[in-house]
Amino acid sequence: MTTHSPVVTVDGPSGAGKGTLCMLLAEKLGYNLLDSGAIYRVLALAAIHHGVDLNSEDALVPLAANLDVQFKAEGELVKVILEGEDVSAELRKEETGMAASKVAALPQVREALLRRQRAFSAQPGLIADGRDMGTVVFPNAEVKIFLDASAEERANRRMKQLQQKGLDVKFDRLLSEIQERDDRDRNRAVAPLRPAEDALVLDSTSMNIEEVVVQAITFIESKL
């Protein structure tokens, strides 16, 4: 094992199972957890709590740089703790998402949050969940995993999740939304979604989560 704090990055498209994998890896290894997908929502919520103007880079940058947030894997959920308070439910509100879109459009805020995310790297280690963790945020990470699955399989998983909540959804619509998002993510000008050159690419299309975890742990142990 290395004496410093190892970083394990897990990137991949929406619905591939990154969140579940990262939560289980953090629990098994006892590592810290970073959910980069939630970080802009967390900042937006902090701004709302403190009455900060969502359009003011000058006000948002110091808030982003000193963001007091923790991600804790508990059971099958990731708790998000902002300034000592569990804000997991608040993060899912539509108004939080809209506010997050505003702050994410500000270049200096993005740069400040990039530095803040890198500060999550601490003993005993870090599991970083995102889309550009291995390519942009932690390009020198010891372990990089790219978790993928076919668009059809991801749409099927999403449909089952929504049906369990009692929602009537159409497979074709979900598939179309996922394909459109994939296209945006893979072709955007800044930090397009792609595996790092030294990443292990895991295709979970025909794997269950236990099989994915076993392969990920084996790869991590071979690298550290």
UniProtKB/Swiss-Prot annotation:
Catalytic activity annotated for this protein?
Answer: CMP + ATP = CDP + ADP; dCMP + ATP = dCDP + ADP
GO annotation (BP), single: nucleobase-containing small molecule interconversion
Q: Any idea of its EC number? A: 2.7.4.25
Q: What coarse category fits the chief subcellular location reported for this protein?
A: cytoplasm
User: Binding of ATP: at which residues?
Assistant: G12, P13, S14, G15, A16, G17, K18, G19, T20
Superkingdom of origin: Bacteria
HAMAP family on file: Cytidyl_kinase_type1
- Keywords on this record? ATP-binding, Cytoplasm, Kinase, Nucleotide-binding, Transferase
Transmembrane spans: none
Any one annotated GO CC term? cytosol
GO molecular function: any one? CMP kinase activity
Stated family: Belongs to the cytidylate kinase family. Type 1 subfamily.
Q: Which InterPro entries match?
A: Cytidylate_kin (IPR003136), Cytidylate_kinase_dom (IPR011994), P-loop_NTPase (IPR027417)
Q: Which SUPFAM superfamilies match?
A: P-loop containing nucleoside triphosphate hydrolases
Q: Under what name is this protein listed?
A: Cytidylate kinase
Location in or out of the cell: Cytoplasm
